[in-house]
């Protein structure tokens, strides 16, 4: 293994960690900076191209469960996590990635596969896989394409909509990378 490959691998690990840490802290601006300017994020909810679209999507995820306005007559049933968000607070959330496999294909292209767990103050919420592609941009390896695949989520939890808006207890998907 060449030194540049080791540097690429560590930069990619750092990129994945920054995505999680910034997202967990509600720093969406910094979270989105781990994507290339024309980066792509795919989830069960859709495909988002470019930092602006990814930012809008991430902001909508953070807003999930908030009532339209304080004077809304529409009754909104929220989970405890969504109630925290409705009060303008970032709840306790933590992303954990594990079993990350990185394939550095060239000096300009790499792929990674990771399992993730998403925890809230109530415990395990949902879990799945990230399938990522990376490229160096201005000397930093950034995500050019992230495909988030939710394998399972608990009904009523934050991630219940992560599989395209469905409230699910378990999703059946192939476990291969």
Model-derived regions, located:
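Solvent-exposed loop/turn segments connecting transmembrane beta-strands
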Residues: 122-124
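Short, low-complexity N-terminal intrinsically disordered segments enriched in polar/charged residues
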Residues: 1-29, 33-37, 49
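A structural preference for long, well-packed, hydrophobic secondary-structure segments
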Residues: 9-10, 18-22, 112-117, 127-128
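Short beta-strand edge/turn micro-motifs at domain boundaries
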Residues: 111-113, 127-160
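Short, surface-exposed beta-strand-loop junctions and turns on beta-sheet-rich folds
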Residues: 49, 118-119, 149-150
């Amino acid at each position: 293994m060449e030194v540049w490959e080791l540097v690429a691998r560590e930069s990619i690990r750092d990129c994945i960690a920054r995505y999680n840490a910034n997202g967990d802290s509600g720093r969406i601006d910094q979270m989105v900076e781990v994507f290339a300017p024309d980066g792509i994020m795919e989830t069960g909810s859709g495909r988002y191209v470019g930092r602006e679209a990814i930012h809008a999507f991430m902001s909508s995820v953070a807003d999930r469960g908030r009532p339209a306005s304080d004077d809304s007559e529409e009754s909104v049933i929220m989970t405890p996590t969504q109630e925290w968000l409705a009060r303008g607070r970032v709840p306790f959330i933590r992303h954990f990635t594990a079993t990350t496999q990185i394939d550095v294909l060239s000096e300009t292209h790499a792929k990674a596969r990771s399992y993730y767990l998403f925890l809230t103050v109530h415990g395990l919420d949902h879990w799945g896989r990230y399938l990522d592609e990376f490229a160096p941009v201005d000397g930093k390896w950034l995500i050019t394409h992230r495909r988030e695949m939710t394998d399972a989520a608990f009904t009523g939890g934050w991630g219940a909509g992560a599989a395209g808006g469905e409230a699910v207890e378990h999703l059946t998907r192939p476990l291969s990378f």
